[in-house]
């Protein structure tokens, strides 16, 4: 966006914008908000800009527990997505809410990685997590690195930068099939392929965010949902569900 385009979008003038850039004029609270909105500045950074200019933050930052209506909405979506996995993550990819789908996916994951806050990235790629059972590990690691790098570029954050460096340092799984590329010219998206004791399951993932957040925490939450990528996965999940229900029935 050019200076002229920004000034027009913010209903200001290039002269005033130039004066703000050179320090010959002090920004008002209103003009900071207008410029920030035109530049799609995240709410957290908008608050930081206001504080730097001597103003109070415009957007509250509540805990997830305080966001009652949003939490109910997320819980509803997560539970409706059963029997497939779905979870809500914060800006550092820590899981804040989840459903109880397919515990078989997490068999063999270390107790350390299961302790709260559970980090979704570590859970999937760490050598002590699901990493050794991700059959297209290289693909999924590359996808994750791309997502984290994009996140850092849009909103630099020490926590995300550290997580990115950690993921890049993970050793590739030693199992040969974990290095296997899955080339498919007809494929529209990259699934995650996971080896389980029931067979290989493949999932496509989607990320959903709130459209009009006015709270910093809510603006940084995302719902990640996994969908079966093939009929084999649909059938395996059904088998998992039947076995789990049978186990519960025997235990009761």
Predicted features, each with a name:
Residues 3, 14, 29-32:
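Helix-turn-helix DNA-binding elements, focusing on the entry/boundary residues of the two helices
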Residues 5, 16, 45:
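Residues in the helix-turn-helix
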């Amino acid at each position: 966006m050019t200076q002229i385009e920004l000034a027009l979008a913010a209903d200001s003038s290039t002269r005033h914008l130039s004066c703000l850039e050179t320090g010959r004029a002090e920004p008002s609270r209103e003009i900071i908000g207008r410029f920030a909105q035109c530049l799609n500045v995240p709410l957290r950074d908008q608050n930081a800009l206001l504080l730097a200019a001597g103003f109070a933050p415009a957007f509250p930052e509540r805990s997830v527990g305080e966001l009652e209506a949003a939490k109910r909405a997320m819980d509803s979506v997560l539970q409706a997505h059963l029997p497939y996995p779905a979870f809500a993550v914060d800006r550092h990819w820590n899981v804040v809410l989840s459903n109880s789908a397919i515990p078989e996916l997490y068999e063999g994951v270390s107790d350390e990685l299961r302790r709260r806050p559970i980090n979704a990235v570590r859970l999937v790629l760490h050598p002590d997590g699901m990493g050794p059972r991700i059959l297209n590990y290289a693909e999924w690691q590359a996808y994750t690195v791309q997502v984290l790098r994009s996140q850092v570029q849009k909103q630099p954050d020490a926590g995300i930068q550290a997580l990115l460096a950690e993921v890049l340092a993970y050793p590739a799984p030693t199992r040969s099939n974990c290095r296997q590329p899955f080339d498919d010219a007809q494929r529209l998206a990259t699934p995650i392929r996971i080896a389980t004791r029931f067979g290989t399951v493949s999932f496509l993932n989607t990320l959903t965010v709130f459209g009009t957040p006015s709270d910093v925490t809510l603006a940084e939450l995302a719902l990640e949902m996994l969908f079966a990528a093939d009929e084999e996965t649909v059938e395996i999940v059904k088998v998992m569900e039947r076995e789990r229900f049978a186990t519960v029935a025997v235990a009761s």
